[in-house]
Each structure stands twice: as C-alpha cells, then as structure tokens.
Amino acid sequence: MLDTLRHVIEAHGGLENWNQHKALSVDLVVGGMLWGLKGQFGKLERTTVTVGLGKEWASHQPFGPDNRRTRFSPDRVAIEDAQGKVLEELIEPRASFAGHTLETPRTEPQLAYFAGYAMWTYLNLPFLALHEGVDHR
C-alpha cells in the first residue's frame, strides 16, 4: 500500500476499525437540478441511506412520500413497501441506461440504482482502493 493511501486510510479510522462493521447509515438532505431534470424531484429530499461496508448493497428509506424503501445491488434494484413487499424491480439495472441522454427521464428503479450505486461508492471510499485489482500507482 502506498504511504499516501495508508495515511488516508488511517485518517478515516483505520482498516481494523473499518473491518469491525458491516453497514453504515447516514441521514441525508438531497437536492439539485438533476432530480427534476430526470423527472424525480423530491424522491430523496430527506432520507436515510444504509450501505454495506465492503459488500455492495444500499437502501434508501423513505423513498418518496409514502415510506417506501429501495434495495440496491449491482445486478438488481427494487422498490419495496414499508413491510418489504416488492412493488417494482429491475434486473440488470445498469443496462437500462443504454441510449440515455442528459434529458432522458429516469424511472424510480433507475433512480434507486443511481442513488444506491453512488452512495455505496461515496461511503466506502477510501477503502475501495484496497479492493483486489485496484492499481495504486
């Protein structure tokens, strides 16, 4: 591991501490022009996201005004009611973005995929740099 990466990992609590935990939850206030442009204004305005630490998964709750939640993993995303009943799901969600432009609206499962993927990445940094296959040069 490079000295700089080692320093950054230690500044984030260290690998030993990180490995003692399986998940992390964060309360969020999310805004910006993108959500309205994509037809999903306010869906994630105030939410709690929980992400797996290491294993790639995430969940936002509430998702919209009726206390639904999302379940994100790389090859599946679902929208569930508060009791866990699947209301809508998308298998291989990344492929559903083929041909999209900046103006293309997103479906709710696409929003759940985008938000889950982004938050899992953000909240697992800098530890993602330690994953097998990552070049530290």
What are these regions (language model features)?
Residues V8, S59, T101-P105:
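Generic, low-specificity signal for short hydrophobic/alpha-helical stretches with a mild N-terminal bias
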Residues M1-T4, R137:
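Short intrinsically disordered, low-complexity coil segments enriched in acidic
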Residues T4-L5, T107:
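Hydrophobic alpha-helical context, especially transmembrane and signal-peptide helices
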Residues D3, E10-E88, P93:
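N-terminal mature ectodomain segment of secretory-pathway/periplasmic proteins
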Residues D81-R137:
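Flexible, processing/modification-adjacent segments and terminal tails
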Residues H7-V8, Q110:
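Alpha-helical interaction segments
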